[in-house]
Each structure stands twice: as structure tokens, then as C-alpha cells.
Design a protein with these regions (language model features):
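Glycine-/small-residue-rich beta->alpha transition segments that form the dinucleotide
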Residues: 185, 189-194, 360
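N-terminal Rossmann-like FAD-binding beta1-loop-alpha1 element of flavoenzymes
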Residues: 9-32
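An anion/pyrophosphate-binding glycine-rich loop and adjacent beta-alpha core
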Residues: 213, 219-328, 380, 389-395, ...
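FAD-site-proximal beta/loop scaffold in flavoenzymes
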Residues: 159-175, 180, 321-363
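Conserved N-terminal glycine-rich FAD pyrophosphate-binding loop of Rossmann-like flavoproteins
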Residues: 36-69, 73, 239-242
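Glycine- and aromatic-enriched mobile tails/lids
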Residues: 1-7, 24, 37-39, 47-53, ...
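Conserved redox-cofactor binding core of oxidoreductases
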Residues: 96-177, 182, 189, 198, ...
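Short beta-strand to alpha-helix junction loop
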Residues: 76-89, 123-141, 152, 200-208, ...
Length: 518
């Protein structure tokens, strides 16, 4: 496209966060950018586990919030955790109103599943492992019928338009070329960073574009070092790799090594139900020691596999693995980014005119390690809060804005980047590897003229090098201890390409501990 379009609100991204936000904005007009045909290539559609919500007998908002805080290893904002749990029931009602067919018990109540690090069964699912696909299908259908939404399919943002420190829309790229969308408010909802790693469960295009674009424009980004590696990606050499949902371990599946030994009890008392970072490191350790890792579902699921977990079953059978009678080979894979563009509790970033929600945002809800099945919930909760803030807000003037599109990364450099990120910024890291990675990425970024993927990788690696402790999804073999005081990390652009660490949360008057500064 070579046109200039205008709208009240521009939503960059068409996953769960972006689409649920767009629907709730009605009747305020908005444009939604979907880089692929609607419903395709969004990581939300691949989510197997479900949505966490404290709906069961004996469960509560306080318990859900406490589990979220515990999983986050000291960095979750307690007020945000409470907000997330408090809004969960209403967001489930939104999905039910759209016709999402969540699994139910014989009495008609919602079926609630147990997942790792949850103290109560509270995950609502669809046909075992089809939650993401079913939710996205319902949202896409509603979006196509919504008169206030203009959908641009096959179009992605490449840079944010800026005018006197205010974000004014985006420079976009589609099948017919580049164009401009001017907007009074712009929302980033583009997903994560898994495509920066060699083994990932994310779409390969998920390379941290929102982080790079926001940082380039001057927004504060935070907690970028915290990458969640899913412990049970199916190890069949696929790119991206399918995963074996957390719910399988919740149902009693065991992790075993080549000797058939269930090994998780050696690493954590919660065994298979330990938090994802703990399980991922255990699987990594077994594989590194040459003992391998398999998920044995034969006793817990067995012959019921096709009906209870159809997505996992199909992925296994396509690789000539029958999980009814064979253990599933597994390995950790880059799955979710806890960091992102820093926002307040209403989804506003540090730049006027710019909001963020979903995986590309850093809301304070995930800390150093996200609680299983909180990601879809967080997308909906903050998408709704942004919509509620913008729907009736006083309209600002449209601004012209300016931006320069960065070059695209070439295939050879991207392949090398993914290898380096997996090796030096993976499940286990150390200072020497991270320092070498920062040097390599910086040189590659300068040589290539600053592609967004390389900028995002440099920011992540720099944050990981700066954090000299082990916490949650960030594990340093040269600094295995956890500091007694938890601290989030915040970065902002310094000059054209430099990075400056902040000494305080941009949305809090309280300074960070002294060790948080560069």
C-alpha cells in the first residue's frame, strides 16, 4: 500500500490482545493491522493450555494472585497480580458471550484443570488443548462483522510515527508497498521474541518488533532478560516446534530420562508441577548430561489421547510418535517473553499516544517467570483496560509524524543470530557468553543498518549481561544465587543507539535499589 490512512486508534497486531481490544473499543473507529490473514500466524491461536481464572470452589482472587506472585520470583507487582485475577471472571464471560466452547462438567459448570505452580485447578480449556484456536476463531468472526473496525490483512508496522515526542501512528508495509497510518492513539500488540531463537514454539516472525520500534521511538522497555523456555517442546526438529501442553503434566504425565527414571523429584519437591523455569532447567540438565528427556503420558492419558489432547496427538503422530504407547521426546524451547514495552496499569507506555498489551508489553504481571495460562488472561485484561481508557477519551488532533523504516534482516544473519541467541542467551547463561553475544549483535546491527530483530536481540542480551544473579527465567551459571532484594530492570535509548539503565520504575516515585543501575 502507498496510501495514507487515518483513524482514531491504530492497533498493531491481530492476536488475542489486539482483537479483543478492537472489539471492546466500539463504537470508536480503529484500524487493525494483521501481518497475515486474520487468525493465522498469531501465537494466540497456538496456545494449548487455556485461560487461568479463579472460578472453582475453594479458589479465590487472592490465591490466584498469590500463585502469580510466587511464580514471578519476587518481581511481580502485587497490585497488578490482584488486578489480573480480579478481572479474570469477566474476561471469561466475554469469551463465553462470543461462543467459545469451553469444556464443561456433567453438571454444566466450566471444567477447571490443574497446571504447574497453580495451587488450585483453575484453567479453562477447549477440547483439552484447542483453547487458543477456538478463542481466535470466535474473535476473528466477531471482528469481521464489526462496523467500527477496519482490518488490513497482510500489513505490518515497520516504524512508529513520531511528532514532538508524541506517537502519531505507524509506517506500514504490505503487498503493494509502504504506506502510512496516522492515528490519535497507537497500540502495540505484536507478540513476542521467540523467532530470535533457533528452537521456539512461536511463529518465526515473532522477533521483538514492538520492543525495537518502541525503544527506537524513545519508550522505556523493561525486564527484557526474562525469557520463558517451555520445558516440553516436542523434540522433532520442527521450526517452529510444537509443544506438549503443561496440562499433560497436570494430568499426571512424568518426565523420564533414557533409563526410564522419573527425574524431576531430584530437582524440585513439586516434581512435574514445579514452575516452568525449574522444569526447563531440569530437562536441559538431563539432556546436557546425555540422559535425554521424554514425557511419558502412557499411564496418565494413554488410549484417551486423541480425544483429550488432539493437538498434541496430531503433532506426535505426524512425527511417527504414538504417545499412547511411546514417551514423547522433549526439549526446552523459547516460548514467552516476560519483558517488553513498559506500561502502567491502564496499558499506557511512557510515550504519549502509545499503549501496549499482550506479550510485547511489560505490565508487572509476570515478573521473572510467567505463571502457566496467565498469558491469554493478561492479553484480555490489559486489552480491555486500554479499550476502556481510549473509548471515551477526548480526541487529540491527528499529527503528521515522521519515521524511517529500518532495513530487513537477511536470511544468513538471522540464522546466525538464532544460533547465537540459543547458545549464549538460552536456558543457562554466563557472563562470557553474554558479553560475546552483545559484541557480535552490536557489530551485526551496525553493519546491517539496524534491523529491528538485531536491535531487540541486543537489548535482551544487554539486560541479561547486566543482571548478575539467577532469578526465574534468567539463570546465570556464573551467578547462581538470587539477590535478596528483587529489582526490575528498565532501559531507555541514550542518543542514537546507546542504552541507559534507569534508577527507578518510570511509573513509580520509588527509586530502585542501588544495584539496579548500570
Amino acid at each position: 500500500m502507498t496510501d495514507t490512512l487515518e483513524s482514531d486508534v491504530l492497533i498493531i497486531g491481530a492476536g488475542l490482545a489486539g482483537l479483543s481490544l478492537a472489539l471492546r473499543l466500539a463504537p470508536r473507529p480503529c484500524i487493525v493491522l494483521s501481518p497475515a490473514p486474520l487468525g493465522q500466524a498469531a501465537a494466540s491461536a497456538w496456545a494449548q493450555g487455556g485461560v487461568a481464572a479463579p472460578l472453582g470452589r475453594g479458589d479465590s482472587v487472592a490465591l490466584h494472585a498469590a500463585d502469580t506472585i510466587a511464580a514471578g520470583a519476587g518481581l511481580v507487582d502485587p497490585e497488578i497480580a490482584a488486578l489480573l485475577a480480579q478481572d479474570a471472571a469477566a474476561r471469561i464471560d466475554d469469551l463465553l458471550a462470543l461462543g467459545v466452547p469451553f469444556d464443561r462438567e456433567t453438571d454444566g459448570s466450566l471444567s477447571l484443570s490443574q497446571e504447574a505452580a497453580h495451587s488450585k485447578p483453575r484453567v479453562v480449556r477447549v477440547a483439552g488443548d484447542l483453547a487458543g484456536r477456538s478463542i481466535m476463531r470466535a474473535l476473528a468472526s466477531a471482528v469481521r462483522c464489526a462496523e467500527h473496525i477496519t482490518l488490513l490483512e497482510g500489513v505490518r508496522a515497520v516504524a512508529l510515527l513520531e511528532h514532538d515526542g508524541v506517537i502519531a501512528g505507524a509506517l506500514v508495509r504490505g503487498p503493494r508497498g509502504d504506506g502510512t497510518v496516522r492515528a490519535r492513539e497507537t497500540v502495540l500488540a505484536t507478540g513476542g521474541i521467540g523467532g530470535l531463537f533457533r528452537v521456539t514454539t512461536n511463529p518465526r516472525e515473532a522477533r521483538g518488533a514492538a520492543i525495537a520500534q518502541a525503544f527506537r521511538a524513545g519508550a522505556v522497555v523493561g525486564d527484557l532478560e526474562f525469557v520463558q523456555f517451555h520445558p516440553t517442546a516436542i523434540d522433532i526438529g520442527a521450526d517452529p516446534t510444537p509443544l506438549a501442553t503443561e496440562a499433560l503434566r497436570g494430568e499426571g504425565a512424568r518426565l523420564v530420562n533414557t533409563d526410564g527414571e522419573p527425574f524431576m523429584a531430584r530437582y524440585d519437591g513439586a516434581a512435574e508441577l514445579a514452575s516452568r523455569d525449574v522444569v526447563a532447567r531440569a530437562v536441559h540438565a538431563e539432556r546436557s548430561a546425555g540422559r535425554g528427556a521424554w514425557l511419558d503420558c502412557r499411564a496418565s492419558v494413554g488410549a484417551a489421547f486423541p480425544e483429550r489432547f488432539p493437538t498434541v496427538f496430531s503433532a506426535c503422530m505426524a512425527a511417527s510418535i504414538d504417545p499412547r504407547i511411546q514417551p514423547i521426546p522433549v526439549a526446552p524451547a523459547a516460548h514467552y517473553h516476560m519483558g517488553g514495552v513498559v506500561t502502567d496499569r491502564w496499558g499506557a507506555t511512557t510515550l504519549a499516544g502509545l499503549s501496549a498489551c499482550g506479550e510485547c508489553a511489560s505490565t508487572g504481571a509476570n515478573g521473572a517467570n510467567r505463571l502457566a495460562s496467565n498469558s491469554l488472561l493478561e492479553s484480555m485484561v490489559f486489552g480491555a483496560r486500554i479499550a476502556d481508557r481510549l473509548r471515551d477519551a477526548t480526541q487529540s488532533s491527528l499529527r503528521a509524524g515522521h519515521a524511517q523504516a529500518p532495513p530487513q534482516i537477511d536470511v544468513a544473519t538471522l540464522d546466525a543470530l538464532r544460533e547465537r541467541m540459543s547458545r549464549d542467551c538460552g536456558v543457562v547463561r554466563d557472563g562470557r557468553g553474554l558479553a560475546g553475544l552483545v559484541d557480535w549483535v552490536t557489530a551485526a546491527e551496525q553493519a546491517a543498518g539496524g534491523p529491528s530483530a538485531l536491535m531487540a536481540a541486543r537489548l535482551i542480551a544487554t539486560a541479561a549481561l547486566q543482571r548478575r544473579e539467577s532469578r526465574g527465567g534468567h539463570w546465570r551459571s556464573d551467578h547462581p544465587a538470587t539477590d535478596p532484594i528483587g529489582r526490575r530492570s528498565f532501559m531507555v535509548r541514550d542518543g542514537q543507539q546507546g542504552i541507559r539503565f534507569l534508577d527507578r520504575d518510570p511509573f513509580s516515585p520509588q527509586p530502585l535499589p542501588r544495584s539496579a543501575t548500570a
